[in-house]
Amino acid sequence: MSKFWSPAVRELTPYVPGEQPRERLIKLNTNENPYPPAPGVEQVLREFPVDHLRLYPDPSATALREALAETYDVATEQVFVGNGSDEVLALAFQAFFRQSRPLLMPAISYSFYPVYCKLYDVAYRSVALDDQWRVPLTAFDTDNGGIVFANPNAPTGHGHSRDAIAALLERNTESVVLVDEAYVDFGGESAVPLVERFPNLLVTGTFSKSRSLAGLRLGYAIGSRELIEGLERVKDSFNSFPIDRITIDAGIAALHDRAYFEACRERVITTRERTRQRLESLGFEVMPSQSNFLFVRHETYEGRAIFGELRERGILVRHFDKEALSDFLRISIGTEDEMDSLIEALEAVCR
């Protein structure tokens, strides 16, 4: 604590990201894509004219927003972009959720949500997951100043159908419903087609997972024009140039190579299902997943103990200190070779 900190900063409990090791480890703890970005991204990086870096980027990132609009079949005016989906989410919390009524969110979900609430003085209420570790959408049918949830959820991996989200929106018309789709490309069903019917729906996404661009920081939101205008007002009161020139061009290149995107996505899904079966044969309970990770617990061994044993063997997975999750591990899907190494290590640990 410093005497120079404001009282609000003293009260913060910051988000703790997954470990980013300096030594060479098999890294299955932060849900990064195991495959490189599309070849067009590498071409952008190799051929980018360095002299252009002396110029500010387009503050609206119009070309990138146009590419996203084409990809998702919406108008350019319905697209917002930011420096990673974390920034997009942070701006959305400021723009829409500082209300007299509480924001509703799952008790177990992306742990940045309560951090934003504390930072921006957003009143919120957590909703417990059901006995199958699913977000209970009907539990959001109470008086609220907004609803936010990840679909598929993290760290559990379960995703709701588009019809289920539409039913939620039919019942909640007076506040913003934010659906965080960071993992939707690995088997979930996107809510983006619903934005034409529901002006209070905001869908956020990221290039970090299915597009392999975690190192460049690029996220987006899709919604009604009035919601996008609200995000722009907050952004332009904070940072008018959140996306640099290289990232704009790289993002466009990633979007244009649909075949590469589909191939990588299918590889991750195939490896996930193969890994699920192998984990179950070792005595793990594996939650159904529509994401690029598996949420698991062993019938005998404690999660923390397995986490430590794997780390000693050079493999990082994610363990959460939260009491309700202490028996669980979240395992990112890596390459086939990386998952083979994981299974080999677990065979030794859980013998």
From Swiss-Prot:
Belongs to the class-II pyridoxal-phosphate-dependent aminotransferase family. Histidinol-phosphate aminotransferase subfamily. The keyword Transferase applies. Gene3D superfamilies: Aspartate Aminotransferase, domain 1 (3.90.1150.10), Type I PLP-dependent aspartate aminotransferase-like (Major domain) (3.40.640.10). The modification N6-(pyridoxal phosphate)lysine is found at K209. PROSITE patterns: AA_TRANSFER_CLASS_2 (PS00599). The keyword Amino-acid biosynthesis applies. Its EC number is 2.6.1.9. Keywords: Amino-acid biosynthesis, Aminotransferase, Histidine biosynthesis, Pyridoxal phosphate, Transferase. One of its GO terms (molecular function) is histidinol-phosphate transaminase activity. CDD domains: AAT_like. It catalyses: L-histidinol phosphate + 2-oxoglutarate = 3-(imidazol-4-yl)-2-oxopropyl phosphate + L-glutamate. This is Histidinol-phosphate aminotransferase. Pathway: Amino-acid biosynthesis; L-histidine biosynthesis; L-histidine from 5-phospho-alpha-D-ribose 1-diphosphate: step 7/9. Its cofactor is pyridoxal 5'-phosphate. It comes from Chromohalobacter salexigens (strain ATCC BAA-138 / DSM 3043 / CIP 106854 / NCIMB 13768 / 1H11). GO terms for biological process: L-histidine biosynthetic process. It comes from the Bacteria. Homodimer.
